[in-house]
Amino acid sequence: GASALAIKPPKGSAFGCPTPPMMPKLHQACLVVGPRGAGKTTAVVNLVERLPFDRIFVISPSMKSNKELMDRLKIDLQDVFEDPDDIGALDAVKVAIDAERDDLERHLAEMRRYKWLMKEINSDKPHYRLDAGDLSDFWSSRAGNFMEPKHKWGGRRPCCALIIDDAMGSQLYSKPRRLNQFTIYH
């Protein structure tokens, strides 16, 4: 019957970042179009400010000169690419996002090791069988105890944004295949 054809969505959320009510759900690709002076950048900054982004990348020839917007969004200068004709900027953003992923995977692996070590220490098994490397990796002489591994985003997947501004007519849009691929796959 009809129940055999029922669609079963995958478990978990399709949205990687928790989004406040009354805000567009993340992840998304958002295009803001308007004539010069229409307030496009201001609108994007106000939207991005209200969303839970941990790291914001920018490709724009004018963003570094707009200190107020940079400060409001807490954008790190290393995440700003000023030349929209440099197609390598997309590669640099991808490398940075991949590094965030790798850091999270490293942290999750460390947490598994840490939890296993704590379970072993608190068990009735002889402690001399524990690996010295595991013991030293998590021991803090300052705290005088074993310390849980730390992650800059608290062990969760970071929410990242890419803002491309003042790039009309640049190589970024002239060779859109790279930008399209980046947008679709990330």
What is each residue range found by the language model?
Residues 1-19, 63, 73, 85:
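N-terminal pre-Walker A segment at the start of P-loop NTPase domains
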Residues 4-6, 68, 76, 89, ...:
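Acidic/proline-rich low-complexity IDRs
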Residues 16-18, 28-50, 61-65, 87, ...:
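Conserved P-loop NTPase motor cores
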Residues 52-75, 88:
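AAA+/P-loop NTPase substrate/partner-engagement loops
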Residues 53-54, 78-82, 185-186:
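Short, surface-exposed linear patches
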Residues 74-76, 180-181:
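Glycine-rich, phosphate-binding/catalytic loops in enzymes
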Residues 76-94:
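Short acidic-hydrophobic, aromatic-tinged amphipathic segments that line or gate anion-handling sites
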